[in-house]
Design a protein with these regions (language model features):
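Short, aromatic/basic-enriched loop-to-helix "N-cap" motif that marks the start
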Residues: 63-65
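Short secondary-structure transition hinges
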Residues: 6-46, 67, 94-99
Length: 118
């Protein structure tokens, strides 16, 4: 979750770019289908194996890997897609905004962890 958030911090326009490419550009859609989605499916498969082991041990609550992955991605992406709106009510600039983004990253991690905790 943190690595994904950091990737988006370094490339804040990436989520909207990918979204626009999928919606409006057949070539862009095909590139996403061939490059991003296989990696996404692999990540879900690996996550699912780990989750199933922990669910069997009773250390985490049952959850589908796809749902957990979509939740984590959604939490992270929203901060960047809605950034113009967020800046209206956060009213933090420069270092304060950087601190806000760090808090947001940690909050996203905590939300996902709380979904797993028994």
């Amino acid at each position: 979750i943190e690595a994904h958030f950091d990737l988006l911090t370094a490339n804040p326009e990436l989520p909207l770019f990918i979204y626009r490419e999928i919606l409006t550009n057949e070539c862009g859609k095909e590139i996403c289908r061939k490059t991003l989605f296989p990696n996404f499916r692999l990540a879900i498969s690996l996550l699912d194996r780990s989750l199933q082991e922990e669910i069997k041990k009773g250390t985490v609550r049952p959850v589908k890997a796809e749902d957990l992955m979509v939740s984590a991605i959604s939490l992270n992406i929203f901060v960047f897609v809605a950034n113009p709106l967020i800046q209206l009510f956060v009213e933090e600039k420069g270092e304060e905004y950087h601190q806000y983004m760090e808090r947001r990253k940690q909050e996203n991690v905590e939300i996902i962890l709380s979904r797993l905790r028994k």
